[in-house]
UniProtKB/Swiss-Prot annotation:
Protein kinase domain residues: 199-472
Cellular component per GO, a single term: cytoplasm
Name of the protein described by the UniProt record: Probable serine/threonine-protein kinase fhkD
UniProt biased composition (Low complexity): 84-126, 516-561, 590-611, 651-667, 708-739
Matches recorded under InterPro entries: FHA_dom (IPR000253), Kinase-like_dom_sf (IPR011009), Prot_kinase_dom (IPR000719), Protein_kinase_ATP_BS (IPR017441), Ser/Thr_kinase_AS (IPR008271), SMAD_FHA_dom_sf (IPR008984)
GO molecular function: ATP binding; protein serine kinase activity; protein serine/threonine kinase activity
Annotated organism of origin: Dictyostelium discoideum
Annotated S-S bridges: none
Enzyme class, broadest EC rank: transferase
FHA domain location: 47-150
Catalytic residues (positions): D323
Amino acid sequence: MDEATQRQDPIEETDAEKKVQVVPSLWGRLVSNHPESRHIDLIEHSIFFGRNPKRCQVVLHDPTVSGIHCRIFREEIPCQKYNNNNNNDGDNNNNNNNNNNNNNNNNNNNNNNNNNNNNNNNNNNNTTKNYITKITDTSSNGTFVKGCILGKDKTTIIQNGDMVSFTSAKLISSLSFTFLDLTNPYIDEPFEEEMNKKYSIQGILGTGNFSVVKRCIRRDTGEVFAVKIIDKKKFWSQTKTRRQMESEVEILQKIKHPNIISIIDIVQSDRYFYIVLELATGGELFEKIKQKGRFSEPEAKDTFKQILEAVSYLHDLNISHRDLKPENILISAVSHGKSSVIKVTDFGLAKIIGEKEMATTLCGTPLYVAPEIIRNCLHGDGGAQVNTGYGKEVDVWSLGCILYILLSGRPPFDFDHTNNFNLKLINQGLYNFSLPVWDVVTENAKDLIKKLLNVDPTKRISTKGALSHDWFNDDDLLRCSTVIANQSPISKSPQRSHGVVQLPVVDVKSKNIPMTLNSTTTNTTSPNNNNNNNNNNNNKNNNKNIIKSLNSNSNNYNNNSVLKKTSQSPKTKSNRPKLQFEQPSPNQHNNNNNNNNNNNNNNNNNNNNNNSSGGKPAIINNNGNLYSKFMATNNDPFDCTPTSTPVKPITNSTTTSTATSMPTSNSVTMGTSSTSIPVSNSITMKSPSILALSDDGDKKRKEKESSSSENVNDVIVINSNNHNNNNNNNHNINNGISSKPPPKRLKGS
């Protein structure tokens, strides 16, 4: 039957077609690796993914996704079934057909046709439909398969457990999925049929001496778990290990706590023992410590309290973990606005301890092992002493080591496998808080560590006592937000870079009162301010565009930053502010000269105030806003608070020859290359060369200040008045002022 006939048959049987409806079945699923993303069911044989809703069955709302990002489709492949009976029947038919061919030529063609039909029937009976799944990348930014970018117009086969990501190679992302083939009954690993009916086994998460932990997906719900697969052949003859495994299962079945990995399912077969566990996708606490170097005290308190509550719950059930360490503490995926949830896992060494029963098995990690275990280990070989065993107190010691690491990024005892010197340090409890990182840790935290790391197990604090410690009631931890150098043994501590400190914005244009950065002086105004303002109002239009540009460093001072450093270095001249000004009109020269003469007396009276105030450096951004570099009160450059009290302007140039004054006469004088800048209020600025906290800048500043006391002519006012009235300008130089009308607005604001 040709293709045209196949297309016409459904048209002739329209009524019958309405009675029969073929519903596509679910053949695959993309299981989301992110807790807040949903799964994607694969029903059609060819599915397009992308941002274009008209051409894609699955629309992905992400700016990095292309219109047609990729295509996932299935291809049918034949799979032969070997049947000996059918093969023998086919051979007999072929022999009979050959005999008929010898007898009659006319029947030969018929027999050949029948023979071909029989062969076709045999082939149809011996084949079954099977599919492979492929993915084609059609995107610009790339589609990631198993962590590697596929490449545009390239196709590859995806199998059970392969990770497919549409945006990045990261495992946990909003568009990262794990492919699950629901129709293929075969998997690569030789796992039991009962387990395969319920779960799809995928990549390895961890390995042990007798078990392997893998990722698994429940087929009916798509939920992701971790399964611990134990091969019975490796331990079934070992009584001690067998009891240990049975004890672990018994413990896990009893535990129900939000901070402990819970057991989901148990499947046992002749060969394997499967323990399906809750999966924490946030990684290990050990990796988080390596990444951060150390935790702030509030973070450490929140994390350690969850660990302590989990261990206390175990101890209430008369259970000891025996192997507490950051590697066995997992972090669940963090949702937006929620704190991370800690999960204690790996009970491979845990046992149920009776009231009169004490375990004497040496176990645990040496870095977190308790002194009583060390004593038993050191005296066990010689047989001089009988092992006294140990109980739940070993978990408390391990908790003390974990808290020490959280707050410092370093272990309390560095273990060396070459000798037992460090074991003696553990046995004697020789640790200290000498690192600089401990300077900002509260005494309550240190006291809790001391009680947890008590070498005498009888005097060691319990988990209940630790939860009621004063450290968990101490909420005054604001000073712990200070930036501390990274003390992690993994990475070196970064060098502190000198930069400009940013403070909250002070808008000098919004008020009509003079303002400086010294909050200790009182508010006084010049009696000639009104005259200056009246004269300057006539020339507002001429100076409307006085400031054409300011240095690019002002872009770093934004309104949202309170205390932030910049990476720009102002040591070179190219980084200093470059100012461009327009020449004032000739009529303005005379007005400015008169104003300058009137202001000389007032400025001379303010010399003493200027000497005592020590004017603070400031910055004006393109919007005309004032930014203070330092407003320290206790000689601490990082104790910065914005001034709110208007004070008297500082205008004495004899003590600030390298500084810039912005008096009420609406001008600014900047250092040896200063220029008059019209502003609306009075502030004091130092030279931009001082704004960088560098050694070179401090040295140059001191040289300029020493030279300024001898020659006040180092302060030069770039003004067109200089060539007209030198005498007046000399007075202006000595007083560090210059008069210009204020602009109506700053250009570029």
